[in-house]
Amino acid sequence: MEDFVRQCFNPMIVELAEKAMKEYGEDLKIETNKFAAICTHLEVCFMYSDFHFINEQGESIIVEPEDPNALLKHRFEIIEGRDRTMAWTVVNSICNTTGAEKPKFLPDLYDYKENRFIEIGVTRREVHIYYLEKANKIKSEKTHIHIFSFTGEEMATKADYTLDEESRARIKTRLFTIRQEMASRGLWDSFVSPREAKKQLKKDLKSQEQCAGSLTKASRRTSPALRILEPMWMDSNRTATLRASFLKCPKK
């Protein structure tokens, strides 16, 4: 699973997921399913905000990354992917600027057009069950919830899906592709079932022992762009360059 994640997600997303797991004291070598889930969630959050801007009239518009008007205000502020201290700093700044009610839990995005925080969910189960779990945890009508599944289903607060159909279709297609790629590698069942995950972990550990040399070499690969992209991500003036450059899963 770890190899799959490193092959199928942008290196920047992988790095952010690694930092998140380290912050919570989790070992990605053991919690490989969580590693994959975090990367998937991060990518959905990025794709959710891709190309969406607000023009001078306050209207939401879609602009491709090569468009010269890309200096327009981003519609969404991405909170997910930052360390907790920085994330809460961003949330507090938004609340002070917009007058929005401070959420009890860290949300994933802020929508400047609708003036609301958004909680994004990606589930391997039934969307309505996961939605209810999220709603019960958050217990706030101010935070908008939007759930996606790997089967193409979605559910949102008051059936308000925020994005246009094409943008949501991109997310659904990507999730379906991830599912297919996992299935082709025999990883999907373990990703869905904790019991199967334990079996897969034993296989992975055994495989790592047999070919430790090659895996160590692969795990150390770095992208020259990371040092350039990181400040772009942490700075509020991030661009669509990173978010539009997601790597496609290589064929098995």
From Swiss-Prot:
Q: Which UniProt keywords apply?
A: Decay of host mRNAs by virus, Eukaryotic host gene expression shutoff by virus, Host cytoplasm, Host gene expression shutoff by virus, Host mRNA suppression by virus, Host nucleus, Host-virus interaction
Q: Which InterPro entries match?
A: PA/PA-X (IPR001009), PA/PA-X_sf (IPR038372)
The UniProt site entry described as Important for efficient shutoff activity is assigned to: K202, K203, K206
Give the primary localization class: host cell
Provide the GO MF annotations for this entry: RNA binding
Q: Which GO terms describe its biological process?
A: viral RNA genome replication; viral translational frameshifting
What domain of life? Viruses
Please name the catalytic residues of this protein.
E80, D108
Site description Important for efficient shutoff activity and nuclear localization, residues in chain:
R195, K198, K199
Task: Tell me which Pfam families the record gives.
Answer: Flu_PA (PF00603)
Cellular localization per UniProt:
Host cytoplasm; Host nucleus
Q: What family classification does the UniProt entry report for this protein?
A: Belongs to the influenza viruses PA-X family.
Entry's free-text remark on domains: The probable endonuclease active site in the N-terminus and the basic amino acid cluster in the C-terminus are important for the shutoff activity. The C-terminus acts as a nuclear localization signal. The C-terminus is recruited to host protein complexes involved in nuclear Pol II RNA processing.
Its biological purpose:
Plays a major role in the shutoff of the host protein expression by cleaving mRNAs probably via an endonuclease activity. This host shutoff allows the virus to escape from the host antiviral response. Hijacks host RNA splicing machinery to selectively target host RNAs containing introns for destruction. This may explain the preferential degradation of RNAs that have undergone co- or post-transcriptional processing.
What is this protein's record name? Protein PA-X
Q: Which organism is it from?
A: Influenza A virus (strain A/USA:Memphis/10/1996 H1N1)
